[in-house]
Amino acid sequence: MKYLAAYLLLNAAGNTPDATKIKAILESVGIEIEDEKVSSVLSALEGKSVDELITEGNEKLAAVPAAGPASAGGAAAASGDAAAEEEKEEEAAEESDDDMGFGLFD
């Protein structure tokens, strides 16, 4: 994500994004750079406009299912244990993301 953000910043400023410029942006804010990831992002974005990237991203987001419908009262009683287990798993997943030393673009 940090590489994409740097790519978009360069593009918005009217510059042609390349590996050197992306590295310079990320290093200016103290982010460690992985050369193979920079190359991978550049090759994946080669020949695409920002508008195409946004359209493609919107299509992918539209495909992500939203929250499911609320269950009926009778069904909730039957699936209470399953819901409690799912809630515990979600809480554990949320807690694992709490400030693990990641920066803004990690």
Curated annotation (Swiss-Prot):
GO terms for molecular function: protein kinase activator activity; structural constituent of ribosome. The keyword Magnesium does not apply. It is found in: Cytoplasm. The modification Phosphoserine is found at residues 40, 43, 49, 96. The keyword Phosphoprotein applies. Signal peptide: none annotated. InterPro entries: P1/P2_N_sf (IPR038716), Ribosomal_P1/P2 (IPR027534), Ribosomal_P2 (IPR044076). The modification Phosphothreonine is found at residue 16. Phosphorylation is not involved in the interaction of the acidic P proteins with the ribosome, however it is suggested to affect the ribosome activity and to participate in a possible ribosome regulatory mechanism. This is Large ribosomal subunit protein P2A. It comes from Saccharomyces cerevisiae (strain ATCC 204508 / S288c) (Baker's yeast). The gene is RPP2A.
